Amino acid sequence: MNLASDKLEQLRTLLGGYGSCLVAYSGGVDSVFLARVAHEVLGDRTLAAIADSPSLPRRELQEALEIAARFGFPVRILQTREFANENYTANPANRCYFCKHELFEDLRPLARAEKFAVIAYGENASDTGDFRPGALAAAEFQVRAPLKEVGLTKAEIRELSAQLGLPTADKPQMACLSSRVPYGETVTPAKLRMIEQAEYVLRDLGFRDVRVRHHEMRSPEFGVRNENVAANSTLRTPHSALPLARIELAPVEIPLLLANGKLATVAEELKKIGYAHVTLDLQGYRRGSTNEGLSVASGNPA
């Protein structure tokens, strides 16, 4: 057996020792793999719980539910309330801590009520190099990270996911929509809807590694009505900030945006969504670009 296969057997043994397990599920590479293996080992003694809030794209939620149905593991949707927490919406560099704290705070009573011995989430061995406030919340709630505990890296999880036939094996890295808003700028459901719609425009044109970073340009002192913002946008008011979209694509995909009129199409569609300005980041997509300028990385590079 190769090293990844050895670790998979260690994971199965570890999960079996739990007896029962509640998995924090998102539909991403790591949590799909964890939920699939946990169900293989524990059967009906496991449950995947997905947190639904404005920070989760609707397509991601639907895809996560479809994967669970396809592979036969049970899933529960939890409506989380992080947007009621001013510590979260203020969008500090440790925003992920407050998100994960809310999630684990909701998972704990569910685990107790349905007698799951362990709560687990999908942190892996490749995550150890970052400052990860979410991991601090996990430690506070005694949430286990079995992928990390057996030393599985992201590359190995992708390899094993392919062997198990999971459609997420080559899924691009994902992160919550709130990660598109620069630290210190308030996170709101309205902003996240704009980001979500803008990224759909690009994904529907065939782009895979996509981030639309949401910035706000301040109007002059006495305010300027933004005539470019769609009439039905909540941002179309005098004295408001002017929303700017900074598009990040994989460097190899940037030439595709410049071809066949796609650049004009994207600009037009994003202005319909409500962006006053649409820009392209010439450095391309890179994880954690919102962290640039910070002394430490954030907890969820996106």
Show where each model-derived region lies.
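ATP-dependent adenylation/nucleotidyltransferase module used to activate substrates
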Residues: 1-163, 218-220, 226, 232-233, ...
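Generic alpha-helical secondary structure
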Residues: 8, 104, 191-195, 259, ...
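Residues at alpha-helix caps and immediate loop-helix transition turns in enzyme cores, especially N-
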Residues: 60-61, 173, 258-262
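Mid-to-C-terminal catalytic subdomains of enzymes
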Residues: 152, 158-202, 206-211
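C-terminal boundary motif of the adenylate-forming
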Residues: 208-218, 281-283
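A short interface-forming secondary-structure element
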Residues: 242, 246-259
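A conserved acidic, glycine/proline-rich C-terminal tail/linker
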Residues: 255-270
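Short, low-order "capping/linker" segments at domain edges
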Residues: 288-302
